[in-house]
């Protein structure tokens, strides 16, 4: 399936720093960078205020660059509980911002992104930065690391989009076939029930057997 022209917004979620990027798919595996940046919120501010700032900033990006889909890193961390919770709060705000605009969201684990970009699911940040700089033909490495991660997420989705679209198409076809079979089964069951009721009715009242139901149809020449 052709995904040329697909515009993807990649987001590396975080409450203190949230990496944002927008790329556009070209032919084959070609991807063009559109924009990249980082949204920051003050650590000493109230949680609600920080989430509000993040929501507004991300919403402005979505409205300005009009992406077709959002790619977000899945929270997959066993570090500081407070950091993990803050990141989870940020992810919720990001998904809500996308939902308010009717934008689909796809989430990827860090290892999935690393595998897609570098071929190594355990690549370090330096390797990832080198690869994303080369893939997008950037004049210099994107900084900070959150920006590079956001670009990697967006490119990862661009490359996986054709596979996802094929899978979705196959799933839709399978669902349609499944529904068709269910409907046929229901229709067959309804016919069997109706015929059984008619037979029972005729057996209990011979007069009805001599006079077909008004719902029966007779073809005449």
Swiss-Prot record:
Residues that hold Mg(2+) 2 according to the record: 73
Keywords: Cytoplasm, DNA damage, DNA recombination, DNA repair, DNA-binding, Endonuclease, Hydrolase, Magnesium, Metal-binding, Nuclease
GO terms for MF: crossover junction DNA endonuclease activity; DNA binding; magnesium ion binding
Biased composition (Polar residues): 192-203
Region spans: Disordered: 169-221
Cofactor: Mg(2+)
EC numbers: 3.1.21.10
Binding residue positions for Mg(2+) 1: 12, 146
Any single biological process term in GO: DNA repair
Subcellular location: Cytoplasm
Active site: 12, 73, 146
Cofactor note: Binds 2 Mg(2+) ion per subunit.
Domain of life: Bacteria
Reactions that this protein is recorded to catalyse: Endonucleolytic cleavage at a junction such as a reciprocal single-stranded crossover between two homologous DNA duplexes (Holliday junction)
Assembly and interaction partners: Homodimer which binds Holliday junction (HJ) DNA. The HJ becomes 2-fold symmetrical on binding to RuvC with unstacked arms; it has a different conformation from HJ DNA in complex with RuvA. In the full resolvosome a probable DNA-RuvA(4)-RuvB(12)-RuvC(2) complex forms which resolves the HJ.
Function summary: The RuvA-RuvB-RuvC complex processes Holliday junction (HJ) DNA during genetic recombination and DNA repair. Endonuclease that resolves HJ intermediates. Cleaves cruciform DNA by making single-stranded nicks across the HJ at symmetrical positions within the homologous arms, yielding a 5'-phosphate and a 3'-hydroxyl group; requires a central core of homology in the junction. The consensus cleavage sequence is 5'-(A/T)TT(C/G)-3'. Cleavage occurs on the 3'-side of the TT dinucleotide at the point of strand exchange.
Protein name: Crossover junction endodeoxyribonuclease RuvC
Gene this protein is translated from: ruvC
